[in-house]
Amino acid sequence: SGGPPAFRWFVRGLGRLVVANRPADAALIESRVSDGRGLLADDGVSISNLFSGDAPTSLLTMSGLKEGRAGLGPSQSYAAFFTHPAGILRAVILTVGEVGKELFQARRQVRRRVEPRIHRGGAYVALRAATNVFLRDLNVALVVEAMMRGSTSIYVDFVDYDEIAHHAGVTRAESLAAFYGLDDALRSIEQVIESGVAPRHYEVVLVSDHGQSQGATFRQRYGHSLEELIRQHLDDGQSVAAATNDVEAWGPVNLLLGQLSRQDSVSGRLTKRVISDRDPEAPVAPRGADAKRSAGDDDAPADLTVVGSGNLGGVWFSQHGTRLTAEDIEALHPGLLGVLAAHPGIGFVVVMTGSGPVALGAAGTHDLTTGVVVGQDPLAPFGPDAVGDFVHVSTFANAPDIYVNSLYDPVLDEVAAFEELVGCHGGLGGWQTRPLLVHPAGWSVDADLLDERGRLHGADTVHRQLVRWLERLGHRQDLTPDAVAPVPLPVSLPTGE
């Protein structure tokens, strides 16, 4: 199995990090996983997504941003928004207002001594305005335009709440206020549906693939990062490449800049001028977003690569072409696993042994293959899905040599992100593992897709349910039905094994 173990991960066969919202990497992932039967394969439209879902029309879709591909979509799809005062002028005014709102709300958190909190300044101010206003309005305009063309299905990603909650907190006033903007977006779409002006009737399905968990970051709590903790227990001269800065949020901005630079308009020419000295495929990102070396020869591959995805960390021994076992790691770096497992900010680590994956905690171990627990079960605070989830991700060919999950405080319902984000997702603990699926009341959920607790568990299962709903609506008639189709293959990237 070769599924992505995180939002960004080290691919042994490539000898580098792969990041899902980098255009070249998104295109690589999609080329390996696509079987031509994606969710949007039947005359669908992808808007503001990482991947196209095999849609014939892709707008602001990351996997199509790579030069030479048509995934950005036809220029006429954007013309009305960028040329009509009701579109661009309104968005610009509200975007400027959002900048002022963020500056005020960030200072208010400081004055009121709201904790936990992080610094909210610099590029994030513009990032919030772009994602919470400008892109939202553009997305709505593109959805309505696709509806007026009679497209069979439309899949759009709104990142408003997610982005603000990362920086302000999960239940903070400004984060929750983002839902008003989403309500307005949905209302605009529903008004078009109810008016009957579109050539076909549409139904709306809402999907949130994760929640968010809150807490002071790992660095705020202990004065050092995960990478620095590991580096303290390496031999002198060994190098660590760390990628623990937030890069997820910059994907939508890169999509917007990529599309603007391709427009034959005033805004397009201005964008080209601003980014003229940049590689057109190079993503815009905050300083330090890429993996940074902490020691050693800059020209040689790092000995270790440490990645943070929310409160889930991944550690790869980069110079080894195969995944190391716990026994290998102990021989190379005696005591490192014990140091990580015993750290108060770490709930557990998962490593592969000669007999399968094992979770190690400060006071016990859990064999994920046999279920045998010695001492205190380190997975107990993380819920009944923890074992199955880590059994699954441990099978990924490019899984890290060491998975690291932060602490979880069940009283405060808090975790400790390895990125500098007060709200996070990626690991276990708290609300981040609570997704959402809202569908028309008249649609039924297929019993054969439910797990033993009556849930649609996992992205693959939700995808299959969405496909079946489309089939019941009369779509995908030229494609193999889900019930008899082969299970999609996981992402297959070089492993070096």
PLM segments and residue spans:
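A long, amphipathic alpha-helix that forms part
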Residues: 133-134, 154, 161-204, 228-238, ...
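Glycine- and acidic
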Residues: 121-129, 164-175, 212, 444-452
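Metal-dependent active-site segment of extracytoplasmic phospho-/sulfohydrolases and closely related
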Residues: 185-223, 358-361, 365-366
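His/Asp/Glu-rich, glycine-adjacent segments
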Residues: 1-152, 157-169, 307-317, 321-324, ...
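A structural signal for the main folded, soluble domain(s) of proteins
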Residues: 80, 87, 146, 163-166, ...
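Short helix/loop capping segments that flank catalytic or ligand/cofactor-binding pockets
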Residues: 58-61, 164-166, 214-216, 223-229, ...
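Short secondary-structure boundary/capping segments
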Residues: 64-68, 169-176, 217-230, 322, ...
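Active-site neighborhoods of enzymes that stabilize oxyanions during catalysis
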Residues: 17-43, 47-55, 65, 247-465, ...
